[in-house]
Amino acid sequence: MAAQGFLLIATFLLVLMVLARPLGSGLARLINDIPLPGTAGVERILFRLPGVSDHEMNWKQYLCAILGLNMLGLAVLFFMLLGQHYLPLNPQQLPGLSWDLALNTAVSFVTNTNWQSYSGETTLSYFSQMAGLTVQNFLSAASGIAVIFAFIRAFTRQSMSTLGNAWVDLLRITLWVLVPVALLIALFFIQQGALQNFLPYQAVNTVEGAQQLLPMGPVASQEAIKMLGTNGGGFFNANSSHPFENPTALTNFVQMLAIFLIPTALCFAFGEVTGDRRQGRMLLWAMSVIFVICVGVVMWAEVQGNPHLLALGADSSINMEGKESRFGVLVSSLFAVVTTAASCGAVIAMHDSFTALGGMVPMWLMQIGEVVFGGVGSGLYGMMLFVLLAVFIAGLMIGRTPEYLGKKIDVREMKLTALAILVTPTLVLMGAALAMMTDAGRSAMLNPGPHGFSEVLYAVSSAANNNGSAFAGLSANSPFWNCLLAFCMFVGRFGVIIPVMAIAGSLVSKKSQPASSGTLPTHGPLFVGLLIGTVLLVGALTFIPALALGPVAEYLS
């Protein structure tokens, strides 16, 4: 079993790196504001039609463009969900959503979280899924990538005030990266057996003679961007464990690759744009080390079996509870770590049914800020915050002004970095405390004791860090939970983007200083270790007390 697990992890990472390297070169061209071959004429036409200017923007203008697009998308999606019964492509005549569920869902998909307090096949029409959720899957992913484009330019430019044009970046990211790659993935899913139609739900007779209603819909097109954009919201309630979404072992492997593809490619692009590929490799090494350790821990925990089931006399040589027999323990463990290391949230197994230790690792990966590969764009700018913090700590230890890639890291940048890092832990801990203090929060818990608290902690961690996966056992479709999680998702997304853009605006105005003998190398194994230690230290200090009340207490009981 250990050899199989090692081979699975090694194969996954090898194929991932092979695919991400050329994509990273393409992204580097876009960051450097170089149109891809054959696209310049199309871009000029598309900008001329709505009269959009392609002038360079400072960080405030860039930020306002990103926020404006997302707020408009939030309003449109909210009213679309409220009135979906008036809209076309609703063969099941599904009613509109309640205001709190519509708000929660709109915020969820605009913030790239895709938390779902509903069952897709019984709640949303084809139009809502396709014109509402899928469109936001593209736009939220493009927004995250655009932010990291601007942040990377802050290190490659000097004595300037501009970071590019948000509309140009959003257009290029969507048209030349997300749409083509998602189209290829969708066609592959269709070839493998995923659904893509607009038929009414089909009544069929089962082998037992009973009648069953099979949901239909444009699944493959949404499934592709759901994975590629690290969105994670399933067309069906069972998400990627549903055979209509994820029909074969091959589609399952491709889904995992799609989740990590752009975050990995952005690391390669970062190294290429900065002129030092070692910087990109340093980030990949740090992410990969944490990732491999976490996968190993989850695999080990799940292979050991569930002692609670064993005490009841059930066969628990390995923990198959809540897992698809098509995929098994090892693949389910790998998928769980992939989807929570990235801010995806798609699932092929019930994380609530993992062992206490096996479920704690995905929760902790979210709590450290989704920086181990992370979401498209958001993962890299989240990890870059820890890079700046690690550089600052190293500067304090050696008595030098911290600098990274020739840019001095001053008090302003460190205040903004600390603010950005503290946003999501504050939301998680305060949100979980509020839920446990109120009757409305506790009434949604279906399980008592440490595991019940773990479900609450997981839900708030998932929302605040824009992941979207969940422990079951929490009845989250209530006004209290819909509003609480919507607030966490909104602030967890934009409360980090705003200081990140402010840091970029500060750094781009500075001159690059040449490296000297006293400059801390930020590309070697020493800095990789320092960066990993910084991530672990912040995560440990922040969440150990909360984890001790939940999964740790459950593991020791």
Swiss-Prot record:
UniProt-annotated location(s): Cell inner membrane
GO terms assigned for molecular function: P-type potassium transmembrane transporter activity; potassium ion binding
InterPro entries: KdpA
Membrane topology, as annotated: Multi-pass membrane protein
Keywords, comma-separated and alphabetical: Cell inner membrane, Cell membrane, Ion transport, Membrane, Potassium, Potassium transport, Transmembrane, Transmembrane helix, Transport
TM region(s), chain numbering: 5-25, 63-83, 132-152, 170-190, 253-273, 283-303, 329-349, 356-376, 379-399, 416-436, 484-504, 526-546
A Pfam match: KdpA
First-listed, main subcellular location of the protein, grouped into a coarse class: membrane
GO cellular component: plasma membrane
Function field: Part of the high-affinity ATP-driven potassium transport (or Kdp) system, which catalyzes the hydrolysis of ATP coupled with the electrogenic transport of potassium into the cytoplasm. This subunit binds the periplasmic potassium ions and delivers the ions to the membrane domain of KdpB through an intramembrane tunnel.
Subunit structure: The system is composed of three essential subunits: KdpA, KdpB and KdpC.
Family of this protein: Belongs to the KdpA family.
Matching PANTHER family: POTASSIUM-TRANSPORTING ATPASE A CHAIN (PTHR30607), POTASSIUM-TRANSPORTING ATPASE POTASSIUM-BINDING SUBUNIT (PTHR30607:SF2)
NCBIfam families xref list: kdpA
Name of the featured protein: Potassium-transporting ATPase potassium-binding subunit
The gene coding this protein: kdpA
